[in-house]
Amino acid sequence: MKKIRTIGIDGGVDMEKSIAIDNKEYTIPAIFSYSEKNEKMPTVILCHGTGSQKNEVGNLFVELSRKLLNIGIASIRFDYAGCGDSKADQTKLSFCGEVNDTKTVYQYLCTQEIVDCNNIGILGFSQGARVMAELLKDVSPIRFAISWSGACHNGIGVFKGWFDEYYQEALENGYAKIPMFWREDLLLSKKWFDDIRDTTPMVGIQRYAGPILAIAGDEDELVPYHHAKEIVENSKNNKSKVVIVPNSNHTFNVLIPNASKANDVIEITL
């Protein structure tokens, strides 16, 4: 699967390439945004949240990718197992599997001539930031890390409600069916729950030498905004910083007409 779409007007040099990356168990659908007029572009890996997909809610990652290209930065966004265009069974989704998929995407970027392998950053949204943090334990060359509404607690953290309500079902069936108001039911494997319980992403934050930007909304009811401050407090880079967006929820109001903070968040990110 290699489809290329021209998204610029400058001689057709700004491109979005739909690709499939092999992780040896299934393929990872991805969109690689880059500009052919540049050599060795800095690149950002975009990690979506639980039950979401590579474009993210309200097409946040689509808009971010476009804005990044405008300033000469490539990006890659992709679907975890069973999400978006992924053909893998949804029960294949596990937290450690997401970390491995992200590492596979990083390794793919390092094979691309257009990518400056010494200037790859990563951005995670919600649980995608937790994936990012866990990855930082093993992929130290990442130059910078950005958390959007990140949930990077060690262990269960903000997923306690799901553990209380659905873990027994996962024990009995091998997976739990979790109702979602904005999509069909989410199927999460027992392994997903066990991985969340047993992993320590904040340790990745503590070990990571690069700068971290943590952005959160002050009206986030899923991941309280003070956790963004905890992320930065655990960073050892003095350039790390936290930005709290006023009057903003977990998804930066992107689905609320006339109240979206998405553009503000993207500008802060850039």
Model-derived segments and spans:
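The serine-hydrolase catalytic nucleophile loop
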Residues: G51-S65, Y80
